[in-house]
């Protein structure tokens, strides 16, 4: 099952750094979303890749980290 992992950061700089690390680790940009107003990063990943994505996001000190099943628009 595909998951949407969301990390909320206290600053846009932390969010940008997390986003950039996901890109550098090979996550496709079309599966990433950076919300500059709320300083959130969302990544859509297969369940098997969820722990790795969460580890990357956690390295940047999020205020909150959550995951939920991905819902197609």
What would you call each of these model-derived segments?
Residues 1-73:
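Positively charged, small/polar-rich N-terminal and surface patches that mediate targeting and assembly
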